[in-house]
């Protein structure tokens, strides 16, 4: 009811999908994921033909093809050899099942450098591109991808406190709220602001003069001493999220999402 294709990596999942598709009166397409080295999801290559053959016999599913995922858990870089392995496995599954398995999904944004180099095998006919489109990054090194923008998403927080305070805590210190041991450099008195945001991982201030110092569960502490644009209580501060920051903000019910349509 919600999707035409599902990426799967186990027979048990396929069986449950087949039962659900039967109850819904539809024939659902699945893409069998194969692990070619990144060690995230996927059946091991030497079991791919066997698993696809089993799934192909389920009554309410169509095995649309094979897929893989790279540069995710293990950071393994896509290569021509790994893509050729996937295409070869597709051909073997075709022979074993008699099904066309037309879709061969070679990976995600990490495959773009291989594609741009002209080394992508012709049998790869699908990529699942996300970060490179939305954030404009080459995910292998996070450098800007040619022809894209890196400011398409901004996380905006409001300043709820602005005080000049010491740069080193006063008193004995232990772990912070998240179990980390913090280290501080004495920079004298600094103008510090608190934003109504949570942990600072994976965000970068748009203003290069603003520095993220740390956070509690719902307070982001920033140094605005050298901010290019003066701030005050009630001011908005803008941040550029990376993939992790965008994921957290997108899934949080406490973050309002606004599409501005700006050029």
Which residues does each predicted region cover?
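Active-site-proximal beta-alpha core segment in soluble small-molecule metabolic enzymes
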Residues: 1-81, 88, 92, 96
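Active-site anion/phosphate-binding pocket segments in diverse small-molecule metabolic enzymes
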Residues: 83-263
């Amino acid at each position: 009811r919600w999707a035409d294709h599902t990426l799967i990596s186990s027979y048990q999942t396929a069986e449950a999908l087949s039962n659900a598709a039967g109850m819904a009166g539809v024939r659902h397409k699945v893409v069998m994921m194969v692990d070619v080295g990144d060690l995230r999801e996927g059946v091991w290559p030497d079991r791919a033909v066997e698993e696809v053959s089993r799934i192909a016999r389920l009554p309410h599913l169509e095995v649309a093809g094979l897929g893989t995922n790279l540069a995710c858990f293990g950071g393994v870089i896509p290569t021509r050899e790994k893509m050729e392995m996937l295409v070869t496995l597709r051909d073997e599954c075709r022979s074993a099942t008699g099904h066309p398995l037309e879709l061969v999904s070679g990976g995600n944004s990490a495959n773009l450098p291989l594609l741009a180099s002209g080394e992508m095998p012709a049998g790869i006919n699908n990529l699942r591109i996300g970060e490179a489109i939305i954030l404009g990054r080459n995910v292998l090194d996070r450098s800007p991808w040619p022809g894209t923008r890196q400011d398409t998403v901004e996380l905006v927080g409001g300043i709820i406190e602005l005080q000049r305070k010491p740069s080193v805590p006063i008193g004995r210190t232990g772990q912070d709220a998240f179990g980390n041991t913090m280290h501080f450099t004495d920079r004298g008195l600094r103008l510090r602001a608190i934003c109504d945001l949570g942990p600072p991982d994976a965000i970068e201030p748009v203003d290069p003069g603003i520095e993220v110092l740390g956070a509690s569960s719902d307070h982001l502490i920033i140094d605005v001493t050298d901010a290019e644009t003066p701030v005050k209580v009630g001011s908005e501060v803008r941040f550029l999220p990376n993939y992790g920051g965008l994921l957290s903000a997108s899934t949080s019910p406490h973050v309002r999402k606004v599409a501005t349509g700006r050029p």
